Amino acid sequence: MIDKWVLGLFNRATYSRMKAFLDYCRDRKDIDLTIILGSSMLDKEYGEAGKELMQEYKDYEYICLPYKSYKSEQNRINLISADILKNAGEYLIQIKPTVVLAVADRFETLPFVTAAAYLNIPVAHVQGGEVSGNIDDKIRNACTKMSDYHFVTTDMSLKYLEAMGEEKSRIFNPGCTAIEYVKKNRIFRWDDKNLYFICMFHPDTKNLKEQLIHTEALLKSIVDFCFHKNCKCIWYWPNADRGREDIINLLRDWFEKYP
């Protein structure tokens, strides 16, 4: 008997977390996997990771949800969520999967899980029970309560889900699939002899008013450090949370001043 599984991927982070799982499913003849892509996975501004995924994993069926890059910061999350709820729900009705797999805590995950739950499709949630201290906690916990099976990454996460009232027999701890993939991957070596360091700074969804002050203070500190130590900084682009445009605009201004 072949099971129909549907995996929802809506940003590059969830894609990287599930690569080990995608490799595993390649060798399973009893699993028919369909991958639903949406949101920033299809956005040119964020590298169109969906194209990269479809090129690397040609064995699977793909559904690309209609996507609009809404510019309004206030309405963007609401509109994208509504699109996913409607469009993913329609495809799930057609596919009739055995189980739906949802990953982590991005806002796009919640409407995807909601669509499956209200269609009485079992939901398996990956990376529940974690704590980040921002709005992601609310999304993650809401997804947990609407899911039927839980695949956590740590013993502490497992205990959190038990404390939330989830059935122990439905909670599993396979570890972090992203780490498993890193262990299998080759070591990246850089021949450049110059000194570099990496900076990653994402929007603070609970403190948008002060995030530009924090960003500018961090930029000033990094420029001073690079000047005195004769090194350069590799700065990761902020993720697709509300407030990212303000950070991006500030970064571009500073990058022009200090290439």
List each language-model region with its residue ranges:
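Donor-nucleotide binding loops and adjacent catalytic segments primarily
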Residues: 49-50, 190-259
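Active-site and donor-binding regions of nucleotide-sugar-utilizing enzymes
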Residues: 4-11, 15-26, 66-167
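Conserved nucleotide-sugar phosphate-binding/catalytic loop shared by glycosyltransferases and other
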Residues: 32-77
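Cofactor-binding loop segments of dinucleotide-utilizing enzymes, especially the Rossmann-like FAD-
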Residues: 10-11, 37-40, 128, 176, ...
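A nucleotide-sugar donor-handling region in carbohydrate enzymes
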Residues: 9, 41-45, 146-213
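Residue-level detector of structured alpha->beta connecting loops
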Residues: 30, 96, 120, 147-148, ...
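Short internal beta-strands
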Residues: 33-40, 150, 232-239
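A short, Lys/Arg-enriched amphipathic alpha-helix followed by its capping loop at the start of a domain
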Residues: 21-31, 221-229
